[in-house]
Amino acid sequence: MRDETPEQPAPLRFGYTTGSCATATSLAAARLLLTGHASDMVDIVLPKGQHVAMRLAFCRATDGGAEAGTIKDAGDDPDVTHGALVFARVRLVHEPGVRFRAGPGVGTVTRAGLTIGVGEPAINPVPRRMMTEHLAALAAEHGYAGGFEVAIGVENGEALARKTMNPRLGIVGGLSILGTTGIVRPFSCSAYIASIHQGIDVARANGVTHIAACTGNASEDAVRARYGLPDIALIEMGDFAGAVLKYLRRASVERLTLCGGFGKLSKLAAGHLDLHSRHSSIDLPRLAQWAGEAGASAVLQHEIRAANTSQQALSLALAHHVPLGDVVCAHARRVARDIVPDEVDVETLAIDREGRIVGVAR
């Protein structure tokens, strides 16, 4: 088997989520208000009990409150917020508890289907709980009986959000504050997978019955041209086919179209649910075998086995009128069919490098 985009493994660093950054900065700003002490480091406890110290970029008093910021270090995770300034602006209020607001660069929820209600700042439940627990402990330590108003912001967050799925999810004005463990694990892409699940939830909550999970922009364009689906029905799954298929077990839809490049679909057809080259490779001998089942001669099968890429294998098959794209889609559909509930109508589409549909199975 050949890997079309080989990568050299290297040691990778862990990082911290925007939720951890928000917790650290809100705690530092609140502590300044209650004690008069401005910190340059702040200790927080992550949801699984780990204690971490986070460095602050600033911690200072403001008119009527205090603010603190930190530079988000995502480690070696491919994250649009890596290096961004995450900050909290805190005011003391009479009513106990914590009230959250969206500061500059943090979005507001405008569609049903997410874990946060419509009209609320896009600060997810675990970061909210982390901040609430840390601020409650601080208040108890200093005998403070009032509450806190906390606005979380991200510098340049509105522009960064355009590189995420937030606009499609109906989160407007900026980024989401995320995290379930407080730690960013390198290449776990947990935030990306969570956004896939959110996309499905939002589609369902808004009455969408046919969703299309696509590996990239070209496959989205192909599905949009074929079916005229609205953006809310398009799920950008990237390489995470398994994240879509497994989630549909508990959040079912009437109809699912899976669309991707021929090479990606051939990986799914071979049973791989993570389509990235780190985790799965193009299986040219298997493509040759499938071509043989579709009528390819022994000579053509040999040429496919010796091909440099999946696209070359496809071109060879098409030149001899062998429907390799349809065969791959049929196998990919079978893999998907084994995972999703029986009531889901599953279709698979494969496209070539020019975005043309070269395989269909339904």
UniProtKB/Swiss-Prot annotation:
Its EC number is 2.1.1.195. Signal peptide: none annotated. Gene3D superfamilies: CbiD-like (3.30.2110.10). It catalyses: Co-precorrin-5B + S-adenosyl-L-methionine = Co-precorrin-6A + S-adenosyl-L-homocysteine. It is an enzyme of class 2 (transferase). InterPro entries: CbiD, CbiD_sf. Pathway: Cofactor biosynthesis; adenosylcobalamin biosynthesis; cob(II)yrinate a,c-diamide from sirohydrochlorin (anaerobic route): step 6/10. GO terms for molecular function: cobalt-precorrin-5B C1-methyltransferase activity. GO terms for biological process: anaerobic cobalamin biosynthetic process; methylation. Keywords: Cobalamin biosynthesis, Methyltransferase, S-adenosyl-L-methionine, Transferase. Belongs to the CbiD family. This is Cobalt-precorrin-5B C(1)-methyltransferase. It comes from Burkholderia thailandensis (strain ATCC 700388 / DSM 13276 / CCUG 48851 / CIP 106301 / E264).
